[in-house]
Amino acid sequence: MPKGKLFIIEAGDGSGKETQTRLLSERLLHAGHRVIPVSFPDYASESSMLVRMYLRGDFGTQAEDVNAYAAAAFFAVDRYASYRMKWGQAYEHGAIIIADRYTTSNMAHQAVKLTDAGERDAYLDWLYDFEFQKMGLPMPDAVFFLDMEPDAARHLILARARQKGMVPDIHEQNAAYLARTHAAYRMLAARYGWVCIPSSQN
């Protein structure tokens, strides 16, 4: 049996990835496909412990307090555990996987910590080798980038935090970091041929 498909819904924080992942999964299910939606980080799993520690500021209150390679490894290990324990076999047997974030998030969120273009390219090459070659995670068949302006996304982040009584994580609290990450997403989308979907808070 041929392998399944892996589709990624990608965007900056607060841009509606969870909603779009659910809607696409439901549409494909209704069309008769075997579909498994997944979300990263996998907060319900022990594998996300280092991610949770990083995002709540245990290693430093600024994203830049943890270097790109270390932070990327936290997220990659969480993905590896999810793949091996939750959806890898289904994918290998033909299921469609719809992921809310993936390696593509590591590409944007950690690359912005590197100001030199050569260092960013070296990081992206390392990440490709680390996650797809060394760890053996499957490569996406398509990436859909929800392109929402960071000011609009930040408004939604803060509204969601108030509604749920939560504290935004160290990425979400930093407006300048969110703006740089959004610019990185646009650059990556152009470089790697992601499908760009203009989005707004409406």
Identify the residue ranges that each predicted region occupies.
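Residue-level preference for the first positions of well-ordered beta-strands
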Residues: 4-8, 96-98, 194
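Glycine-rich, phosphate-binding/catalytic loops in enzymes
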Residues: 25-26, 54, 114-117, 160-163
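ATP-dependent small-molecule kinase phosphotransfer cores
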Residues: 31-135
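Structural signal for short hydrophobic segments within the conserved structured cores
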Residues: 36, 142, 195-197
